[in-house]
Amino acid sequence: IEQGAILEKNELINSNEFDGLSFDKAFEQIDKKAKKLKCGQRQVNYRLRDWGVSRQRYWGAPIPAVKNSKGDLQGAEDIPVVLPTEVKFSGVKSPLSEMEDFTKVSLEGEEFIRETDTFDTFFESSWYYARFASFDNDKAMLDERAKYWLPVDQYVGGIEHAVLHLLYSRFFYRCLRDLGLVEGSEPFLNLLCQGMVLKDGSKMSKSKGNIVDPNEVIDLYGADTLRLFVMFVAPPDQSFEWSEQGLQGASRYLNRLWNLVQDHLDSESKKELDFSDSSESVTTLRNKTHQTLSKVKDDFLRRHSFNTAIASIMELTNAIPKEFLSVNAKDFEKSSVREAINTILISLSPITPHITHALWNQLGNQNIIIDV
């Protein structure tokens, strides 16, 4: 206490009958006593915010309401409200407010003005994932296909959405559930919150002037190099500092991979892959190849640890003996190299699709590598 607050969940002290209890047990006992004394109860508090409607576009979701001459609001009867497409932009306010044929509404002999505000992008983003399942249905929000495809197996988004977008999405999904349009209560089965790319220790921002233009990087290094660097430098859920040295390292590896395939093509055996008579060094390389394939599959699909998957692929690249690339290498040695290279290219193809596809075709494969 004298040195600082105890931050860990530990045993309670100076708490009367709750002394000595662990945090979790004390929590349960205090909850029971509070209920018995009718002085409190357990409650979950969400970080709810008023929906600050912003980022509006005139073509956003219409607000189905009209105002009478007194300014009183009431619900519009002509639902859904269909927005006009022929509009003129003044650059000052919504073009809808200038269109009398849209704004003026007559209901039972009384004149009303239609609400010209629209909901913001959060309204659409709260259920867009569901609409993908019925994207071509212009008669309804969703159809039976939504029940097949939803809920979303894996959702990726920034942690900043935890108190806004992700909560709204759950509200919308449960509304869709109550309408019988989807099944279940949760829209996303798994969530991955990706980290940020930092520059000079802070989030990239135009106002701070620390932006790195990806187009300039692609022009200099190529898209595959940029993709490899971003996926290799850190786990996807952690932020990382932009590094020109790291980018150059990714470029060097891809150049090395290209040269590796060219060396193999120069020494390649035209025979079918045959390992019936192989040496201990061939067995070692083959074991490394299959271990890498198993690890990459687990890192990609279960752990979402792309950086460790790439590290394993690089280790396999380093494990190929130089003598196996010689013209004088034995056929089963060349076969083990081909097996290792195939594994490297297939494993890297989701990360660096362009160079791996080109090398895959150079090896005589006619199919598209991403489909292998």
Where do the PLM segments sit?
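Alpha-helical recognition segments enriched in aromatics with Gly/Pro capping
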Residues: 1, 96-99, 104-236
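Basic, alpha-helical terminal appendages of large translation-related enzymes
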Residues: 1-4, 13-43, 47, 86-121, ...
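Glycine- and acidic
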Residues: 13-16, 33-37, 144-160, 211-215, ...
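Amphipathic, well-packed alpha-helical segments that form the structural scaffold of globular domains
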Residues: 31, 35, 127, 131-134, ...
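Secondary-structure transition/capping motifs at alpha-helix termini
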Residues: 35-42, 136-150, 174-187, 220-221, ...
